[in-house]
């Protein structure tokens, strides 16, 4: 009788997960047949890494079964690094359950070669953090990092957990880091991109730069660092509220503004239409101003 072989069992399990989910991973090709991987989100829409796709009029989507469809960009969001392509014909979509990433658990990153055939990489979930904001202002429900190596052509494919459930889409982060855009973020952002072409984000119409609060004012300000107003957009929320160039922004609704990331966190997709209180230093005095956050103008 053959001895039980755990490695063989693991190999067969991974093989089964790839077979079950390979329909999720597709190739997106341009006219020169360069390609990136993507996730087939629904029969007529694929999602991939925004940073990996240019601005061509048309792309070709190729599935593992060899089916092809012409696709055009429906929307893109640099903030969450997501881009959605809408296909001109429906493709056979694979349905898998959604899962949750856990530190130390196995992760299976799928991709596609230029002909649409599945590729697979096995690694570990190295960290799972709370909600965070990218430098471009995008809100992501979790910060998931993988201990795994991906080729650039494999970026944008689905990431599965050890049970074969979908936890998100792979993307290349800082050098040497592979991140996962969580399935919860995909579920929130993709419908917005399909309907509106972009994700609305809050806007104050202010150009800001970090600055130290002058020593004599720190006691009244209650802050050591703020954001100096360097420029003001004509007709923007800041100008309407009476903000002046040279003002130092201390807080927004009581939250300290000690860097651009903190400002971005106050101007996410949920902030549009809110009235907030700005606490400012002007001419050596601390004052407040109410401002209505509007949507950032389309680029």
Language-model features: where?
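C-terminal cap/linker of serine protease catalytic domains
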Residues: 1-18, 109, 162, 166-224, ...
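PDZ/PDZ-like domain micro-motif
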Residues: 153-159, 212-221, 233-251, 266
């Amino acid at each position: 009788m053959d001895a039980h072989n755990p490695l063989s069992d693991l190999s067969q399990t991974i093989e089964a997960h790839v077979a079950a989910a390979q329909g999720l991973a597709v190739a997106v090709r341009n006219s020169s047949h360069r390609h990136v991987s993507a996730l087939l989100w629904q029969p007529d829409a694929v999602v991939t890494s925004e940073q990996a796709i240019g601005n061509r009029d048309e792309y070709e989507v190729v599935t593992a079964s060899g089916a092809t469809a012409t696709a055009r960009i429906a929307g893109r969001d640099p903030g969450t690094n997501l881009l959605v392509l809408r296909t001109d014909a429906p493709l056979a979509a694979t349905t898998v359950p959604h899962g949750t990433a856990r530190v130390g658990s196995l992760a299976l990153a799928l991709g596609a070669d230029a002909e649409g055939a599945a590729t697979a990489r096995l690694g570990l979930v190295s960290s799972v953090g709370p909600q965070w904001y990218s430098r471009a202002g995008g809100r992501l429900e979790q910060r998931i990092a993988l201990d795994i190596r991906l080729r650039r052509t494999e970026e944008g494919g689905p990431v599965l957990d050890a049970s074969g459930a979908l936890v998100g889409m792979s993307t290349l982060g800082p050098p040497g880091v592979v991140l996962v855009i969580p399935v919860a973020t995909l579920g929130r952002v993709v419908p917005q991109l399909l309907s509106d072409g972009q994700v609305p984000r809050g806007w104050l119409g202010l150009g800001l730069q970090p600055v130290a609060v002058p020593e004599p004012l720190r006691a009244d300000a209650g802050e050591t660092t703020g954001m100096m107003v360097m420029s003001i957009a004509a007709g923007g929320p800041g100008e309407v509220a009476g903000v002046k160039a040279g003002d130092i922004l201390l807080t927004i609704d009581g939250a300290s503004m000690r860097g651009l990331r903190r400002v971005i966190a106050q101007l996410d997709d949920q902030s549009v239409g809110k009235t907030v209180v700005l606490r400012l230093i002007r001419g050596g005095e601390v004052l407040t101003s109410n401002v209505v956050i509007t949507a950032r103008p389309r680029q």
